[in-house]
């Protein structure tokens, strides 16, 4: 039997995460996980560190040539990573 005011489990969990202040952390984790999926294994191999601070994604890349190529695609990468994470998590990328 279904109650008239029943909710989907996903909605209840999302509401709980918002109330506990954990939604941002979850979205940041999703975005960091999306780095490998969006950029693939060839870029992941040269990725040394990824972190997010104040909506800025900081990525350390060990290859100067790859870092320069990614710098030219930063705007596109911000859009693709946010889309993969399902939220506006970052506003810019800093490559080191």
Regions found by a protein language model. Name each.
Residues 1-36, 48-50, 75, 85-95:
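N-terminal presequence-like segments and adjacent domain-start helices
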Residues 34-58:
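Short edge beta-strands and adjacent turn/loop segments
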């Amino acid at each position: 039997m279904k109650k008239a005011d029943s909710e989907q489990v996903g909605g209840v969990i999302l509401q709980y995460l918002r109330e506990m202040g954990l939604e941002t952390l979850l979205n940041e984790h999703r975005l960091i996980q999306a780095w490998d999926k969006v950029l693939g294994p060839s870029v992941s191999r040269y990725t040394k560190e990824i972190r997010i601070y104040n909506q800025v994604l900081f990525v350390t890349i060990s290859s100067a040539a790859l870092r320069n190529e990614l710098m030219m695609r930063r705007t596109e990468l911000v859009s693709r990573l946010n889309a993969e994470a399902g939220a506006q998590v970052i506003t810019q990328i800093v490559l080191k």
